[in-house]
Amino acid sequence: MGLDPSISAIRGLQASLALDGVTVSVSPGMCYLPNTARIQSDGTASVTLSGATANTFYHLYAYDAGGGAMALELSTTAPDAPYLGTARCKTGDPTRRYLITGRTNASGVFRPGRHTRPAEMGNRVMLDAASSAGSLPLTILSGLTATTVQTIDLSALLPVTATRAIVQALNPSTFTLYTSRSAVSAPSPTNYQYVAIPGSSPVLDVTLDANRQFTVLLSATTILGGVIALLTGSVTLTLVGYEFDR
C-alpha cells in the first residue's frame, strides 16, 4: 500500500524573525508528521534562541505540544532526507517537522530576512540588511577577472534544503558572465542558464546542485559570438536571497 500523500502537507506557517534577532515565530497554519498526526498553529507559538554559537545553522522544527497544538524548536541538528516529496523531519526524530533554517552571524543572532513565499516547494527568503544601521549584501565573489570556470560554493551560507540562490551579478566589465549549474556541463557562450552582459547588474535565480554550488565563466565571447579583445573592470556577485523546499 502506498504512502498517504497528506503526511507531507504543509499550509501557511510563514516564519518571521523579531527585532531582537533571536526570536522566531510562524503564522497560522498546519503541517503533518509522518505518523499522519496533524499539528496546527494559531500564530502565537514562538521560540527564542539562547546560548547560540556564532556562524552556525539553526533549524526550526514544529512538534505537537499536546492536542495537536504546535510548538517550535530550534536545533543545530539538520533535517533528514525527505520522507515523502520534499517533507523532512529532524534527523533521528520523526516527531519534529522541518520548517526553515537560519544562520547566526558573528554576534550570535540571525541575519534578518523575509520568508516571502511559504509553501512546500519553492519557499523564498529575501535577506535584509544585517542591522538597523544598514549593511551591504553578502558578497560571494569579488573582483573576478579570471576567464576560467569558477565554482561558487554556498554550503556555508545556505541550508541543505536550498535549491536556488538569488544572486545579483554586478558586471561593469567589458566581458560577459555566464552561469550554470555545477552538475551539468561548464558554462560557456553556448551553454548557460543566465547571462550578465557587459555593463549590466541582473538579479538571477541560480539553480544549485546537491552541494549548493553553481558555476560561472567570465568570457571575452559575447552572446552574439563577437570577441572583445581587452578586459577592463571586474565582476562581483552578491547573495540577496534563496529558495528552499520543506
Name each model feature, range by range.
Residues 2-80, 116, 153, 175:
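Glycine-rich, compositionally biased intrinsically disordered regions
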Residues 30-33, 52-64, 112-193, 236-245:
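Beta-rich globular "head" domains
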Residues 47-50, 138-141, 203-205, 226-227:
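Beta-strand-rich interaction surfaces with strong enrichment in secreted/lumenal proteins
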Residues 93-111, 165, 206-229:
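Noncatalytic modules at the cell exterior or secretory-pathway interfaces
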Residues 1-25, 78-146, 246:
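Glycine-rich, low-complexity segments
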Residues 183-213:
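Glycine-rich strand-loop-strand elements at beta-sheet edges
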Residues 227-238:
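Extracellular carbohydrate recognition
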Residues 48, 150-156, 199-209:
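Exposed aromatic-hydrophobic patches
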